[in-house]
Swiss-Prot record:
GO cellular component, one term: cytoplasm
Cofactor annotation: [4Fe-4S] cluster
Record-linked PANTHER family: LIPOYL SYNTHASE (PTHR10949), LIPOYL SYNTHASE, MITOCHONDRIAL (PTHR10949:SF0)
Family to which this protein belongs: Belongs to the radical SAM superfamily. Lipoyl synthase family.
Highest taxon of the lineage: Bacteria
Pfam families registered for this protein in UniProt: LIAS_N, Radical_SAM
Binding residues for [4Fe-4S] cluster 2: C107, C111, C114
The protein, known as: Lipoyl synthase
Top enzyme category: transferase
Length: 336
């Protein structure tokens, strides 16, 4: 495989403020610079790479986006599409699909790539599962992705709320297939507790994103652990061999080609069935800079390599995201 010819830049890391520099108020969102300033690492000014021609987002016409947003607000629901500033939001909303984000809009982590707000979350909304179940039924969705912020403040990491949402959706829409995109449930005894709870009503697809190569974890996913995430995927699969597992990688954060391939091998070695690979795009000037734009040829080479490794489905392309066309990905893994 050949290395991308797209220009790349070096990354300069500077020491961040202490995460405990100021008390957090429950439910108050910290965004952009306020969030990243609490991270263990920050990024010195770096030249901005011009987006190449293959990074383009289509904005559809019509009222589909506004109609879906209105329905979500009516039911007090949140989508990760909006909260994380996903570049595919117009296409997905235009097709009437969305990835629902449960457990609030405030995350206990401070990942440098993510545009979701950081802070001290409020308690879970006990009415959210019922609202979600009704909304999915009203929209007639056949495939639903449910994700969440990290909830390190909860003893089970939010696993019971996931199960409550799965149960509510299946009660109203028994034919709907459900994919969950979970946090890592990191903490003493938390993974075991979460997996035990998820066994009450497992999803149709279990997704947890590895996000990046292990050497970049400190800069990209402070508070997370590469091996822990691999173990979560493997342990879930061991308990539910019939449920496809899935993970995703972002490119453009400073990784090398061989590091990407090594991470793909690690995922297969931990019994992951499906993989998504896409280009990282910087949400704001405060976030981790884009250090490289990988070419479509690179993504095709990684797709081919993924199938060589034995993944049942590989979605690899500049605009691919974990939940993008998730129903199509699931069909490739035998979910119908």
């Amino acid at each position: 495989m050949t290395e991308s010819t797209a220009r790349s830049i070096p990354l300069q890391i500077v020491q961040g403020d202490s995460p405990s520099a100021a008390p957090l108020q429950a439910g108050v969102k910290q965004l952009g610079g306020d969030k990243i300033n609490r991270s263990p690492v920050q990024f010195a000014d770096a030249p901005v790479l011009r987006k190449p021609s293959w990074i383009r987002v289509r904005i559809p016409s019509g009222n589909a986006v506004q109609n879906l947003k209105a329905k979500l607000r009516e039911n007090r629901l949140v989508t990760v599409c909006e909260e994380a500033s996903c570049p595919n939001i117009h296409e997905c909303f235009g097709h009437g699909t969305a990835t629902f984000m449960i457990l609030g809009e405030v995350c206990t982590r401070r990942c440098s790539f993510c545009d979701v707000a950081h802070g001290r979350p409020k308690p879970p909304d006990a009415n959210e599962p019922a609202s979600l179940g009704q909304t999915v039924a009203d929209m007639g969705l056949k495939y639903v992705v449910v994700t969440s912020v990290d909830r390190d403040d909860l003893r089970d990491g939010g696993a019971q709320h996931f199960v409550d949402c799965i149960s509510a959706i299946r009660e109203k829409s028994p034919g709907t297939r459900i994919e969950v995109l979970t946090p890592d449930f990191r903490g003493k005894g938390r993974m075991e507790r979460a997996l035990e709870i998820l066994a009450q009503n497992p999803p149709d697809v279990f997704n947890h994103n590895i996000e990046t190569v292990p050497d970049l974890y400190r800069n990209v996913r402070p508070g997370a652990d590469y091996q822990w995430s691999l173990n979560l995927l493997k342990n879930f699969k061991a308990q539910h061999p019939e449920v496809p597992t899935k993970s995703g990688i972002m490119l453009g954060l400073g990784e090398e080609f061989e590091q990407i391939k090594a991470t793909m091998r690690d995922l297969r070695a931990h019994d992951v069935d499906m993989i998504t690979i896409g280009q990282y795009l910087q949400p704001t000037a405060h976030h981790h800079p884009v250090l490289k734009y990988w070419t479509p040829e690179d993504y095709k080479a990684l797709e081919d390599y993924g199938y060589e490794l034995g993944f049942s489905h590989v979605a690899s392309g500049p605009m691919v995201r974990s939940s993008y066309h998730a129903d199509v990905q699931a069909k490739g893994a035998g979910v119908s």
